[in-house]
Regions:
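Structured beta-strand-rich core segments of catalytic domains in phosphoester-bond hydrolases
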Residues: 35, 85-166, 260-263
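Sec-dependent signal peptide recognition
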Residues: 14-20
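Active-site metal-binding loops of divalent metal-dependent hydrolases
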Residues: 41-43, 85, 172-174, 205-206
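N-terminal, active-site-proximal structural segment of metallo-dependent hydrolase catalytic domains
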Residues: 28-104, 117, 187, 279-281
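Structural recognition of the beta-strand scaffold that forms the well-ordered cores
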Residues: 40, 79-81, 111-112, 168-171, ...
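Metal-dependent phosphoester-hydrolase catalytic domains
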Residues: 156-159, 180, 184-187, 191-201, ...
Length: 281
């Protein structure tokens, strides 16, 4: 192509480029909400896959948390939910682990709930977010016999690139031992959420798989109008027992577009990452 032909072709090239830009930005111009990416992980008190947080140093706990920071930077979820995460505990350094993760992975917002608070221990569930959070609440479940109390945190965030649509986001941890205790805890979660009108995302270590005698997730589905990604699929998030204990549940006005279990060894659980689409409301 000589210079004259190049000059003649240039306007056509520019028109094509302009059309491509217009096509790529159609969703934004039309005000269609962006995908919302979320992650959930049981941090296991920053012990990674070690036997106990009692047998490691504060430096080792920080190194394990840095691994989570690296994954957050790689995956870039808008919001991450954590369970078994410490705020001020003697066994892993007496510092706020959610704050540590948020600051180092560039998440400007974080909120932690201490469901255990006493005997030099303070830990529970947490959320970190790149979206502003409001109306943050921490709820403790009733303490079962001879084991730690569980609970959840809930916060409201604005769905990115939406027309002022708020979404309620939950990080929850249910009892590990008894089904009846988990059902009692689920009913308390339902009581808190059922009167809230926002779309909802529930994430966490539910300590339950799906089907058979496990009625926990079906109870949440029927009571809160939530669903999950391929509930009967053979997905493993807790390798030790080869079970799916960690879940992302969304209300019926949200679609799970993608769902992945990360292979990184960050704790005895595997992190779950999902991309969500807000349907028309």
């Amino acid at each position: 192509m000589d210079a004259q032909e190049s000059d003649r072709a240039w306007p056509a090239i520019m028109r094509s480029f302009t059309l491509l830009l217009l096509f790529a930005s159609t969703n934004v111009l039309a005000g269609e909400p962006a995908l919302l990416k979320v992650m959930t992980l049981n941090v296991a008190h920053a012990r990674s896959d070690g036997p106990s947080q009692l047998f490691q140093s504060e430096d080792q706990a920080m190194l394990n948390l840095w691994k989570i920071v690296d994954v957050l930077k790689r995956e870039e979820p808008h919001v991450a939910a954590f369970q078994e995460i410490d705020k001020n505990s003697f066994w892993n350094g007496r510092f706020n682990h959610a704050e540590f993760l948020a600051e180092r992975a560039n998440y400007p917002h974080h909120f932690s709930g201490a469901h255990i608070d006493g005997d030099n221990l303070e830990y529970g569930t947490a959320l970190i977010s790149r979206l502003s959070m409001k109306e943050t609440t921490s709820v403790k479940f009733d303490r079962p016999f001879a084991r730690p109390r569980k609970g959840f945190v809930v916060s409201t965030a604005r769905w990115p690139e939406s027309n002022n649509i708020d979404v309620d986001i939950v990080s929850v941890h249910f009892d590990f031992l008894r089904r009846n205790q988990r059902l009692k805890e689920a009913k308390k979660l339902i009581a808190v959420l059922e009167d809230r009108s926002n779309p909802r995302i529930i994430m966490g270590d539910l300590n339950s798989d799906y089907g058979g005698d496990n009625q926990l997730i079906p109870l949440l589905e029927s009571s809160l109008g939530v669903s999950t990604w391929e509930p009967h699929a053979e997905i493993v998030t807790f390798p030790k027992l080869q079970k799916r204990l960690d879940w992302v549940l969304v209300s019926n006005d949200i679609e799970i577009v993608s769902h992945a279990i990360l292979s990184d060894t960050l704790s005895d659980h595997r992190a779950v990452v999902a991309e969500l689409r807000l349907l028309e409301i």
